[in-house]
């Protein structure tokens, strides 16, 4: 399995919050499937970071493409990059 870091940027558009409940339900399902290791907004609310563990980059891209939140108002995908952790807490591994 390979890890991918998804970085998001948020604008001040209040419409962003409308898609968040469905997005968080999807995140919970991905977590339960073992594909999402961690997710959450930055403290300054400028964006968010999500860590996925999947077999291929195509699978990570499909996860992003299948969630309307990522293409909705007020949300921009900054990057989706393969991540190579040097050390990792057991609960994330």
Residue locations for each model-derived region?
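Conserved, structured core segments of small domains
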Residues: 1-93
């Amino acid at each position: 399995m390979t890890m991918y870091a998804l970085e998001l940027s948020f604008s001040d558009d209040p419409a962003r919050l409308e898609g968040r409940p469905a997005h968080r339900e999807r995140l919970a399902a991905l977590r339960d499937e073992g594909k999402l290791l961690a997710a959450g907004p930055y403290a300054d609310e400028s964006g968010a970071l999500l860590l996925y563990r999947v077999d291929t980059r195509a699978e990570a891209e499909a996860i992003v493409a299948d969630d309307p939140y990522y293409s909705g108002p007020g949300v921009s995908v900054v990057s989706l990059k393969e991540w190579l952790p040097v050390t990792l807490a057991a609960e994330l591994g």
